[in-house]
Amino acid sequence: MVAEPHSETSSTPRRRRWRTTAAVTLFTAVLAACGGGGGSGGGSAPNGDVPSNEPPPPVPSAPAAQPTTAADAVRLADQASFGPTEALVTTIKAQGAAAWVAAQMALPATSRYSSGQGDAIHTYTGTADFCTGRGDDCWRDWYSTSPLLWDFYRNAVGQPDQLRQRTAFALQQILVVSNLDVSGTYGFRNYHNNLLAYAFGNYRDVLRKVTLSPVMGDFLNNANNDKDAPNENYARELLQLFSIGTCELESDGSLKGGKCSPTYTNDTVRAYAYALTGWTYPAGGASRYGCWPKGANCTYYGGDMVKVDQYHDTKERQLLGGVKLASGHTADTALETVLDSVMNHPNTPPFIGKQLIQQLVSSNPSSAYVGRVSAAFAAGSYKGFGTGKRGDLAATVAAVLLDDEARTETPGRSAGKLREPVMMFTGVLRALDGTTDGDALGWWWGETMQQHVFRPPSVFNFYPPDYPVPGTTLVGPTFGIHNANTALNRLNFLVYLLDWGGSSATGSTVPGAVGTKVNLAAMSTDAANAGTLVDRLSMLALGRTLPATARTEVVKAVEASGSNAANRVKTAAYLVFGAPQYHVQR
């Protein structure tokens, strides 16, 4: 059993386990039978927050409603939201996939990051430690991403703009920054609000905001980069992770010529590093030690980085695709040329398109599927979605979700993906009418399951997109953080919600604390009939009933749990959401 969080006192009584040994034993039988082992929105923005002034992308014309099946509705909810609810499944069934995606893209962005403190950590000039007199939660509220994590989970569980949030979450796992290396709550708030704002915009605009982000500038050493000997970190990751990848690709994502031909050399990286010199923090920061280097701004995260001409390298530089920066160019010209060169590279559509498929739908998409998504990215349009401009994310996301391979009722053996911990947390909470303030899902469960949102271990995220599944020829990114301990802790998370009752708000210092808990009242209406209850939960979790043998065992366990409605629902929910079919999302 995983330990309780440090915020719990040793005097807190443990709740008695409701499951009998027999019920736990039955879980093993189920595994064998299965073939396997409230939003935080309003209020004024704290200092340093920068609202997006970009016009929203055009709303796609609404496709006609084409009702679909419950199985397809649950599958789409798994792919495009933070988990099915009965109300969401009903909506998707009535609208159909295309109409629902269009309706989601037309929704206003109700989810934004707003919790935490402002920019005073970068305007403070006093001699005492900044946190002196600011209470025990100073580091949490001013420096860490814990306040963003509260907003993330509150919005994921409760806000309606689900597709925008899922797309932004996919982007943040490609365009990675980490609170492990950079501190400043308000800066991370700006960075991730930009990903939400541009989720259905253009990938070129996303790359521009990321390149000019002072948080990214600190994370990958491009802020105040020395023109005489520039740090190459950001230039390398811009090419390797954020745009073209390391091997030349066909438009369907396969290796060009059947082997890895490098897309760039060290000289190429160096040329991009020189091209991206000359950017410093936005104005607004202060320090009692003064700003360094001379002529640059002090550390400050309240906006995009700004150019300092004297620190920009103006020599002729050769970029990819035959693009050349002429001698005497400006920092602005260099930036736009860099972005054009990577956006026009033939690798970018399949490289980014495949990662979006992996994040939303399937770890091992067919080359044909990647090719169709790549074509949508390149054309900027897909069946009425998009502006017709290369890199349009509305078109690309629509292509990912509406492709036949995503919508098929009979997915192939290599289709689907291991449900990542974040999606398990939110999926169970949403399915069981849960609420959360997010607090328990960070330092406790996020750390336990190796996916503490906003704190990936490196720029390579929590797991690489090409992580090999042992003993197979498949890749499974989420398997990079999956092992015997995390597999057991998936079940322990269900124990935490169903047996312990989750977490309460008592004693919490989280603003607007509600704890983390589920509400089983709606499911209790079917508790008297074990078969009906199990099927209702299975349809919500899987989009179908459990396989016959597994269903029989789960129904027996529910019937053996007694007549208490709550215990019957807990037993059924534990066994359904603990089943392998739930954790392997297909």
Predicted regions and their residues:
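N-terminal mature-domain "stem" immediately C-terminal to a signal peptide or N-terminal signal-anchor/transmembrane
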Residues: 59-111
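Amphipathic interfacial helices
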Residues: 144-148, 158-166
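Short, flexible active-site-proximal loops enriched in glycine and acidic residues
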Residues: 163-167, 179-186, 229
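Flexible, low-complexity segments enriched for small/polar residues
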Residues: 67, 74-81, 175, 345, ...
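Bacterial Sec-dependent N-terminal signal peptides
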Residues: 24, 28-62
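Active-site substrate-binding loop specific to GH73 endo-beta-N-acetylglucosaminidase modules
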Residues: 93, 105, 121-136, 140-153, ...
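Sec-dependent bacterial lipoprotein signal peptides
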Residues: 1-32
